[in-house]
Amino acid sequence: MKLNSFLMLATIVAAVFGLAFLVAPSALVALYGVTLTPATEVIGRIAGSVILGFAIVFWAARNGSGAEVFKAVMMAGLIANGLDCLILLHATVTGLVNGLGWLQVLINGGLAAGFWYFSFGKGKSVVFP
């Protein structure tokens, strides 16, 4: 198997599991005989967003271009942190996590904003390698 084919396979696997964890973590882990609580579903959704980020990196890395991989890393950071911010915002507002959840919302939201700024905002003038 060539590297390109392997990374395409890795993209598909990561996208499928990432989406499943993001959208329906309880249903996915129930296939393995595991039961999640509402609070542990939050962790499953966060894992899903990170796995989706890896899918983006794998997809861009399949062609081996340094600039494309770097752009994919920036996009993966934006998507994973943006989704984590939204997931944690919901968990904090609904009381699934305590008040410290607001700190994590700010951290992930700030990171998402930074990834957006350096990908699409005024910081975009930074030359990608």
What are these regions (language model features)?
Residues L3-F6, F17-V42:
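Membrane-helix boundary elements
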